[in-house]
């Protein structure tokens, strides 16, 4: 059910860090309520790209996405970037009105740069604000390192796992760092 207070969490896996030269190879979304309770998990989509595109990945991306099985899923996928974008928007329309939720995640500005370059309709679905968990991580590192260090991430570098970790990390900071 649509609610303007719901939050949209997104994570992208890419072939690199430059949106002008690299591409999105996996995306996932989760919608939570304002108290960070998961309401729905959206589609987890491996986006097809040619072997030529995948061959341009640097060593870190080649190793990481190869070890996780993502590279093979991308090769086997028949979903285009446009189809992935449309499927994700269709999911989000069920839960959050356009322009209401900030884009939520970890280091989310990087994901937003890729969306702006490769999926403009999806990027414009979000409010212009960002809810970036990495901001709290940086503040905790400076003001309460024990709080930051007490949260351990698994870092599978798969989109859905990364979103779940981002939500859990924000829940951790809410409980142990933000005083209200």
UniProtKB/Swiss-Prot annotation:
Q: Which Pfam families match?
A: RNase_T (PF00929)
Q: Where is it found, in Gene Ontology cellular component terms?
A: cytoplasm
What molecular function does GO assign, one term?
nucleic acid binding
Query: Active site annotated at which positions?
Result: 128
Q: Where can this protein be found?
A: Cytoplasm
EC number(s) reported in the record: 3.1.15.-
Q: Which GO terms describe its biological process?
A: DNA metabolic process
Residue span(s) of domain Exonuclease: 7-170
Functionally, this protein is described as follows: 3'-to-5' exoribonuclease specific for small oligoribonucleotides.
Task: State the family named in the UniProt similarity comment for this chain.
Answer: Belongs to the oligoribonuclease family.
User: What is the protein named?
Assistant: Oligoribonuclease
Organism lineage: Bacteria, Pseudomonadati, Pseudomonadota, Gammaproteobacteria, Pseudomonadales
């Amino acid at each position: 059910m649509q609610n303007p207070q719901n939050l949209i969490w997104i994570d992208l896996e890419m072939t690199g860090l430059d949106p002008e030269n690299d591409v999105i190879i996996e995306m996932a979304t989760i919608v939570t309520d304002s108290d960070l309770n998961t309401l729905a998990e959206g589609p987890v989509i491996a986006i097809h790209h040619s072997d030529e595109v995948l061959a341009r990945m640097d060593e870190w991306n080649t190793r990481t996405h190869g070890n996780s099985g993502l590279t093979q899923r991308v090769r086997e996928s028949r979903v285009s970037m446009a189809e992935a974008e449309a499927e994700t928007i269709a999911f989000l329309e069920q839960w959050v009105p356009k322009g209401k939720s900030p884009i939520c995640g970890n280091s989310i500005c990087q994901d937003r740069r890729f969306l702006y370059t490769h999926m403009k309709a999806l990027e414009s679905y979000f409010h212009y604000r960002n809810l970036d968990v990495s901001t709290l991580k940086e503040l905790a590192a400076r003001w309460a390192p024990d709080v930051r260090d007490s949260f351990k991430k698994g870092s599978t570098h798969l989109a859905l796992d990364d979103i779940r970790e981002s939500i859990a990390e924000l829940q951790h900071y809410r409980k142990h760092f933000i005083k209200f």
